């Protein structure tokens, strides 16, 4: 049976989370879906999986709410259900930055479509002649799986480390067009809004993130695969599961080459953690 995997988010003011949460959980359970929905005062973020009929049933219900009517989820297919349970959680932020909350009523950050970004990268500048800087807003272990050519990345371990990293490097963005990007769009949108708020000009988010870029223009100007937070671990530019897997013990990304290493034991250890695991067992 083919499973439809969807991810979607929207920055929108939610003042009824206490009542919305149980209703949303009930609808997901009734549709037979599994996954996670995060609700916060600044919006919604969701990762769901089910049959085509189940997904369509839930999205029809969600779109009936004017606040969510324009949510357009990104889809991929799998042979198995990637989630074990259904969770609907109330959070302070839908993606944790530990900065003042996004003000949805102030509008979205400017975005650039994948096809336009590819054109900018092909020609070496944006439509106004400014150099384009690709800014990776993801964590270091995600970046290691793949990223855009010559992308700037700060080696962060969590998204809350992004604002101070930007503050330290703000001067480097002067006179350039900055395109923030992430897996599916949520982090790069919040990052772009933050950069605008601290006075950085000419900031865009990559519309739909890396996965939308893969879907619309393929892997041009991109090296490697895209890490995803489910059992597939990484997707190639054809949106197919790639070779890397995650180590069950330490959660590090293990490349196909590293999987051939004698220290890689499925479910127990990998070259990144085997020495630590051995010491702990001693």
Swiss-Prot record:
One of its GO terms (biological process) is tRNA modification. This is tRNA uridine(34) hydroxylase. The gene is trhO. The active site is at 182 (cysteine persulfide intermediate). Catalyzes oxygen-dependent 5-hydroxyuridine (ho5U) modification at position 34 in tRNAs. GO terms for molecular function: oxidoreductase activity, acting on paired donors, with incorporation or reduction of molecular oxygen. It comes from Cupriavidus metallidurans (strain ATCC 43123 / DSM 2839 / NBRC 102507 / CH34) (Ralstonia metallidurans). It catalyses: uridine(34) in tRNA + AH2 + O2 = 5-hydroxyuridine(34) in tRNA + A + H2O. Residues 128-222 form the Rhodanese domain. The keyword tRNA processing applies.
